[in-house]
Swiss-Prot record:
It comes from Francisella tularensis subsp. holarctica (strain LVS). Gene3D superfamilies: SecB-like (3.10.420.10). One of its GO terms (molecular function) is unfolded protein binding. It is found in: Cytoplasm. InterPro entries: SecB, SecB-like_sf. Homotetramer, a dimer of dimers. One homotetramer interacts with 1 SecA dimer. This is Protein-export protein SecB 1. Belongs to the SecB family.
Length: 149
């Protein structure tokens, strides 16, 4: 098998596409007992770029922490990467864009959120690992189920 036929995956660039942090109740939140309730949301988008076999994957991680019935803080990061994915079947490329790439980006997104939280004066936030393979398989199943109905 020649070199060109081998599956290829390469990280071209990893970057923060968008970042935000807010403390909507800063006048009240500092005087309450700290018993945080964490809410997270993840989204993955992948876009084909003009360069051959090149894609941008964007992982959006939203975090909202409530304390004593009010929002303590909200943080959002859109962690992006440009990846070259070549010599793979379409199903493998889709998996790379929507499961493998987000897995790489999640480390950076978690770090960005943690840094924002600490800079905001709150205790460090350690987010749990995410199984992007399982999320991708679930999305495939949901897509197949919706096509059957």
């Amino acid at each position: 098998m020649d070199q060109q036929a081998q599956p290829q995956f390469q990280i071209q660039k990893v970057y923060v596409k968008d970042l935000s942090f807010s403390i909507p109740n800063s006048d009240k939140i500092w005087t309450t007992n700290w018993k945080p309730e964490l809410h997270t949301d993840l989204k993955v988008e992948a876009t084909k770029l003009p360069e051959e076999n090149t894609y941008e994957t964007v992982l959006t991680l939203e975090v909202k922490v409530e304390n004593d019935g009010m929002v303590a803080f909200e943080a959002e990061v859109k962690q992006a990467g440009i990846f070259t994915v070549a010599n793979m079947q379409e199903a493998q490329i889709e998996h790379a864009k929507k499961a493998f790439c987000p897995n790489i980006l999640y480390h950076y997104a978690r770090e960005a959120i943690s840094d924002l939280v600490i800079s905001g004066g709150f205790p460090q936030l350690c987010l749990s690992a995410v199984n992007f393979d399982a999320m991708y398989q679930d999305s495939l199943k949901e897509s197949a189920d919706s096509k059957q109905h």
